[in-house]
Amino acid sequence: HLERLNHSLSGIALTSPHSEAALLEMLLALVQKNGGGNLGVYLQITRGPTMKRQHAFPEHCQPTVFAYTFPISEPSDGSTDTASCFTAVTKPDKRWERCHIKSTALLGNVLHMMEAVEEGAEEVLLFNDREELTEAAACNVFIVSSGAVLTPELDHQILPGVTRRQCIELLQRYTDWTIETRPVHLE
């Protein structure tokens, strides 16, 4: 588990504030303080608190380590008398296809933003597998070209931003520019 944790932390450019040995020692102490026995342990390491909400990694931020225990049932001996069953359904994996839902799950956006920052940019424009513009890491996108304002159509890949809607309403009310919501291609 700790090896997988460190692999995941490395994948998001986050360094654990503790060695594996120190984490293991802390987790064992937590289990002891909670009476031992059949306990599960939940461990989470975050980048840490910051006073400014931003998509780029905050500087000078200390990672937060959070852990708790919870009771788990006795392990089954494998016999049919103690084995338990459950039902399951199958669904397409849509975990990364829900950009239109406002949530705190910003990992994809944050990782894209860090790539932009590392390349000296302030934002990143994101394209789907059809080379159509979706949005930027931290905002919706508008392109002004030849007296028209282009913005991608809303779909499951785009968060319907409040500012996006207000910009469209203001442009319609106060300008004679054409507003086109349509696919915007990379070329």
What are the roles of these predicted feature ranges?
Residues 1-125, 129-132, 169-187:
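Conserved alpha/beta cores of soluble small-molecule-handling proteins
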